[in-house]
Amino acid sequence: MWNIMKYVCAEGIVFRGLCGQRCADKRRSVRLWVRGPSTHQIHAVHNSVPFSQTHVVTSPPWRVLFFGTDSFAEESLKHLFASRQKAGSGVVKLLEVVTLPKDLPVRRFALQNQLHVHDWPNVNVQDRFDVGVVVSFGCLLKENLIGQFPYGILNIHPSLLPRWRGPAPVFHTVLHGDTVSGVTIMQIRPKRFDVGPILNQCIYPVPENATAEQLGETLATMGAKLLIDTLQNLPEFVANRREQTSKGVTSAPKISSSMSWIVWEEHTCDQIDCLFRAIGSRIPLRTLWMGEPIKLLDFAGKFLTSLSGAVAETPGTVRYDRESDSLLISCKDGWVAFRAVMLKKRLSALDFYNGYLHPFFLKRFPRRQKECVFESYKTKDSNTPLGREDAHKVQNL
């Protein structure tokens, strides 16, 4: 494994690890020579893939190629762009962008600010960049591409790796009720996501009741600042990088619609709260009402006031509370409240009560009285509620 290791001496700066010899030079960049007619091939610092250029920059400003797509990635691109604009004091000299050929936040920002855009996968590095940066890109980069950057390609990951490897770390942080999160700067490796060595990390206490969107916005800004900090002393961070431990590895797969089904017999109040804050803004929580899917909207939290006969209620039992103007639903360990639902159209809690729970309605349709319970959805060929596996995932690790 090749490393840049810097030593300060009276004669200048000594670099080891770029080849099998020592090189000393007081300038920012170093040319490596060996005996004979040809220039020695320099190896990329992140692995032993041959790197063709003979001129390695050893301090900022850097030539950066940025890979990204969404608003989380856009925040890092904004910080890199701002650094490039700082004449004489920034860490970026050249900045170009690689993104998908779609209308995406990263593409819009790049075009608005006259940054050169490469459409993935048509990327031609041509020995013009010192380091790559990839954020929320979603595509594996091949080894021959990674090897063309002297300092490799850095990744900003919104978790404290190795916890929550995968495409949805912020959602799983909230879903599992983590009290601590953070950002990791790592070097990527080919063939697998989120397994490379760690260069820098920053810890962030998760605020109580934070949603995935709120946490994601905070970590995006934190990650962008941590990236700039890392680039300021990149050779030192590369030299002192550490491999990820196998202890504490967890997976953060993409969120899916099956996660939105509530299992009233198994979900606790806290688990439903975490589930809503994790996915509720993108995928409404769902249950069954009289055999029809119904979406639960405007979650109002755990209902703390005791109800007469509440202890004996069947999970999924629904009541209307006038004081809070919400529907109260019993779950494994208590009651949770929602202020609106979506059946065929959006209904407030009061509208739902008047249409389906009012004593006048129940007198007219006495057979419906036994059906006034929210039920977990069950597959046609199994008695197992859909979402039960996801219900277990909600439990704190």
Q: Model segments located where?
A:
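One-carbon transfer enzymes
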Residues: W2-S281, D333-A337, L343-S348, Y353-L397
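Short beta-strand or tight-loop elements
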Residues: S181, E292, D325
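Short acidic/glycine-rich loop or secondary-structure boundary segments that cap or lie
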Residues: D194, I283, K295-L297
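A short acidic-to-branched-hydrophobic micro-motif
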Residues: K254, W261, M290-S308, V336-K344
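Short acidic-hydrophobic surface loop/beta-edge motif
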Residues: I262, L285-M290, L327-K332
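NAD(P)-dinucleotide binding in Rossmann-like oxidoreductases
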Residues: G280-I283, M290, E313-G316, A340-K345
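Low-complexity, glycine/alanine/valine/leucine- and proline-rich hydrophobic stretches
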Residues: F303-V336, K344, N354
